[in-house]
Amino acid sequence: MSTDKITFLLNWQPTPYHIPIFLAQTKGYFKEQGLDIAILEPTNPSDVTELIGSGKVDMGLKAMIHTLAAKARGFPVTSVASLLDEPFTGVLYLKGSGITEDFQSLKGKKIGYVGEFGKIQIDELTKHYGMKPEDYTAVRCGMNVAKYIIEGKIDAGIGIECMQQVELEEYLAKQGRPASDAKMLRIDKLACLGCCCFCTVLYICNDEFLKKNPEKVRKFLKAIKKATDYVLADPVKAWKEYIDFKPQLNNDLSYKQYQRCYAYFSSSLYNVHRDWKKVTGYGKRLAILPPDYVSNYTNEYLSWPEPEEVSDPLEAQRLMAIHQEKCRQEGTFKRLALPA
């Protein structure tokens, strides 16, 4: 007999960008939809797609590239919505480390990565820039990329601008150094992708659960949309409510990460067709997807109008970079008005 319970697995320990999920819980938005949501945290973030794909968990969060790879590896998952759209992702390093904007300056360096796909990405980039995998030392860091850079265990590592880069900036501030000494070689530019969409954070479902419980998923997403609208309308008030529930995030670092995540929150929750096409192509280029792979996403369970995609995604990325730098300097909550 079907119940109203859903198990939901985060992609990491609670972070600033998980705020819509927890507020949907604490503000009763799930309950309004007749749902009982069990929010779970992974022991190992790399296990998320396997746990959802195997049916041990109903739904969860994962980045686009991992969602694609999971289905290709036999774990039946589908993206039903977006949480964080195109956060800038790249190779992070500190000024003075001997690394420059020239990718070949990474030769002989220790480079950290989160999971196996990070290693595949770095290997593909080294090949593109005339290097070999043996020209650098790969270090698997999990979610500790910034920590390892600070401790000197690695020279550089893959991270995202609104999370690990902010962590490096906070470290620099405590050292009396400018935050701008935290640098990033953006992977979208290095790999000529035209977007940072491979790290878009998605709401994903086990396929069998989705097939049997379409209305549950629709109701879940309605609650998430209401919580997202609440966050975007009053981010300061929303944050106060979030840290009341998650006091471990009541610190300057988490608040600054939240400010930097704010512009990336998907207001519509829609999967962006162009982004999926690009990342599916990128996955085939990395040989983690077969040539005939069909993207595993749907917008069928979103019950509000789909927005038009931006006409010039490269210009949108350029404007977002300027916007995020301004946010770093001023510490404000502002959304970017992208060109139509």
Swiss-Prot record:
Motif (CCCFC): 195-199
Enzyme Commission designation: 2.-.-.-
Keywords assigned: Iron, Metal-binding, Pyridoxal phosphate, Thiamine biosynthesis, Transferase
Catalytic activity: N(6)-(pyridoxal phosphate)-L-lysyl-[4-amino-5-hydroxymethyl-2-methylpyrimidine phosphate synthase] + L-histidyl-[4-amino-5-hydroxymethyl-2-methylpyrimidine phosphate synthase] + 2 Fe(3+) + 4 H2O = L-lysyl-[4-amino-5-hydroxymethyl-2-methylpyrimidine phosphate synthase] + (2S)-2-amino-5-hydroxy-4-oxopentanoyl-[4-amino-5-hydroxymethyl-2-methylpyrimidine phosphate synthase] + 4-amino-2-methyl-5-(phosphooxymethyl)pyrimidine + 3-oxopropanoate + 2 Fe(2+) + 2 H(+)
Molecular function terms from GO: 4-amino-5-hydroxymethyl-2-methylpyrimidine phosphate synthase activity from histidine and PLP; metal ion binding
Any one GO biological process: thiamine diphosphate biosynthetic process
Top-level taxon: Eukaryota
Disulfide bonds: none
EC class: transferase
This protein's record includes keyword Heme: no
Subunit record text: Homodimer.
Function (record text): Responsible for the formation of the pyrimidine heterocycle in the thiamine biosynthesis pathway. Catalyzes the formation of hydroxymethylpyrimidine phosphate (HMP-P) from histidine and pyridoxal phosphate (PLP). The protein uses PLP and the active site histidine to form HMP-P, generating an inactive enzyme. The enzyme can only undergo a single turnover, which suggests it is a suicide enzyme.
The protein's name: 4-amino-5-hydroxymethyl-2-methylpyrimidine phosphate synthase THI13
Species of the source: Saccharomyces cerevisiae (strain ATCC 204508 / S288c)
Upper classification of the organism: Eukaryota, Fungi, Dikarya, Ascomycota, Saccharomycotina
Gene: THI13
